[in-house]
């Protein structure tokens, strides 16, 4: 997914998000300084990959949203392709939550922010739970088990050590896995996980 395949309205919203991200990043650490020059590829298009992984999801929960990846990006795409989709962003840091609320307000997104630790939030029964650069897979699976509906799907964006994390997680968890190779970072993957059970 890139600018050539995205509607003008979505592209405009993504540009607004990009600009807000850089503006706020000067005050609070939303993205690393080393990735500022490559925000589109490293963060926005990378996050956009999860949009195509699930066709229908009325409730999408993004855990540890931070700077809004992938949650805000999902909400931006949903505005045009699935306006009934509600995105819930879970972020415990008050300053980052303030940024997320600003983006939601300025872009009129169907999203809300929960400012709590993930493990303290009441079960959300989501159709999709996502996370990017948040925690080890075993920890993410415990979060997903808590917040997914029975038929829900977890989408975890993982770096080059994803296969090692999967092997380690399989020692204490049972789950169905489909790995999607990342289009922005060949060694990385999006892990599509269902049927999560502790063993």
Swiss-Prot record:
State the disulfide connectivity. Answer: none
EC number(s) per entry? 2.1.1.170
Q: Which GO terms describe its molecular function?
A: rRNA (guanine-N7-)-methyltransferase activity
Keywords attached to this entry = Cytoplasm, Methyltransferase, rRNA processing, S-adenosyl-L-methionine, Transferase
State the HAMAP family in the record.
16SrRNA_methyltr_G (MF_00074)
Role noted for this protein: Specifically methylates the N7 position of guanine in position 527 of 16S rRNA.
Instruction: Please state which protein family the record places this protein in.
Output: Belongs to the methyltransferase superfamily. RNA methyltransferase RsmG family.
This protein's name: Ribosomal RNA small subunit methyltransferase G
Origin organism is Roseobacter denitrificans (strain ATCC 33942 / OCh 114) (Erythrobacter sp. (strain OCh 114))
Which lineage is the organism of this entry classified under, starting from the top rank?
Bacteria, Pseudomonadati, Pseudomonadota, Alphaproteobacteria, Rhodobacterales
């Amino acid at each position: 997914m890139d600018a050539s395949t995205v509607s003008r309205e979505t592209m405009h919203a993504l540009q607004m998000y990009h600009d807000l991200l850089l503006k706020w990043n000067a005050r609070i650490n939303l993205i690393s300084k080393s990735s500022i020059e490559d925000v589109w590829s490293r963060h926005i298009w990378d996050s956009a990959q999860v949009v195509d992984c699930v066709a229908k999801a009325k409730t999408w929960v993004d855990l540890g949203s931070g700077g809004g990846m992938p949650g805000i990006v999902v909400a931006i795409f949903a505005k045009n392709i699935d306006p009934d989709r509600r995105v819930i962003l879970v972020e415990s840091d008050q300053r980052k939550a303030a940024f997320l609320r600003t983006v939601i307000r300025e872009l009129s997104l169907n999203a809300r922010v929960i400012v709590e630790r993930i493990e303290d939030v009441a079960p959300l029964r989501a159709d999709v739970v996502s996370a990017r650069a948040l925690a080890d897979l075993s920890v993410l699976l415990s979060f997903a088990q808590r917040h997914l509906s029975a038929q829900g799907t977890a989408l975890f964006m993982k770096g080059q050590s994803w296969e090692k994390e999967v092997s380690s997680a399989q020692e204490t968890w049972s789950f169905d896995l489909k790995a999607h190779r990342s289009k922005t970072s060949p060694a990385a993957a999006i892990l599509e996980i269902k049927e999560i059970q502790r063993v």
